[in-house]
Amino acid sequence: MDALKKMKDFKPNRIVCLTEETVETLYLLGEQDRIVGVTGYAVRPPEVRKEKVRVGAFTSADIPKILALNPDLVLTFSDLQADIAAELILKGIDVHAFNQRSVEGILSMISMIGSLVGANRKAEKLIADYTKKLETLRKKKTEVLKVYIEEWDEPLISGILWFSELVQIAGGKDVFSDKSKNIDAKSRILKSDEVIKANPDVI
């Protein structure tokens, strides 16, 4: 019975987040005390820089440093961190890889994180708040501006789908919206003359 009770009550209390989104979401849910390590790119909220141990970049990670934190869950993102995830799994670490590519996918990620840490109601409220803000933004009448979304600079990579969707919701037009549907970042690589030819109003 004790073993069954322990399984029922299990929630990860030593989480390592290798993506910015999961860090920010846990803070917004008030579950930041569960975080023991973060990606070096985590900057929101500002206090995360002082409060949490940094364990690597986006496509690289200090595996020994992560293991030393004795995590009971590591949160990763997509195929870009597949090698890191595989190495941690081989070390016996539980890993959950998110793959959010759209606004809907982001909201789903928030819901899943809420479930993982037992903060379902707080996650539902956060999702409802975001949905309301997006609807308000969608209803605003604005000048349609052509927007170039630069996800990366070397090489130039245009924005992923959720970037493009947010621009559209705000009343703009993503000049490379056709590429935004491509999951693989390599298929969104641009040449500088393509950006010049697109003649965006906003970058």
Q: Whereabouts are the PLM-identified features?
A:
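N-terminal ligand-binding lobe of clamshell/alpha-beta domains
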Residues: 1-203
